[in-house]
């Protein structure tokens, strides 16, 4: 599986998450996954909520259309974005 996969109108993102980073950014590839650095700590679901909010803003969809399919308790996550309005350039290069 590649880092970003199309499934009908949805996108599946394979992410490796680095919490408590100095800023939110897409770092690049980490093996077969996209490395996403986020400022939120991995406590009480704050990192997961931050990922959903960050990706919803980037892909211009409501937060409810971003869901973590796999990996809620770990750094390796599979995130579904339902019918994204746009695909940001920094993500599009990995399609």
From Swiss-Prot:
SUPFAM superfamilies: YggU-like (SSF69786). It comes from the Bacteria. It holds the Pfam family DUF167. Transmembrane segments: none annotated. One of its GO terms (cellular component) is cytoplasm. Belongs to the UPF0235 family. This is UPF0235 protein Sama_2480. It comes from Shewanella amazonensis (strain ATCC BAA-1098 / SB2B).
């Amino acid at each position: 599986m590649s880092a970003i996969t199309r499934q009908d109108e949805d996108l599946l993102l394979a992410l490796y998450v680095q919490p408590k980073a100095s800023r939110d950014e897409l770092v690049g590839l980490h093996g077969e996954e996209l490395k996403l650095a986020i400022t939120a700590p991995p406590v009480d679901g704050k990192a997961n909520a931050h990922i959903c909010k960050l990706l919803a803003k980037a892909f211009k969809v409501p937060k409810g259309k971003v869901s973590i399919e796999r990996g809620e308790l770990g750094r390796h996550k599979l995130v579904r974005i339902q019918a994204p309005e746009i695909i940001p350039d920094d993500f599009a290069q990995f399609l």
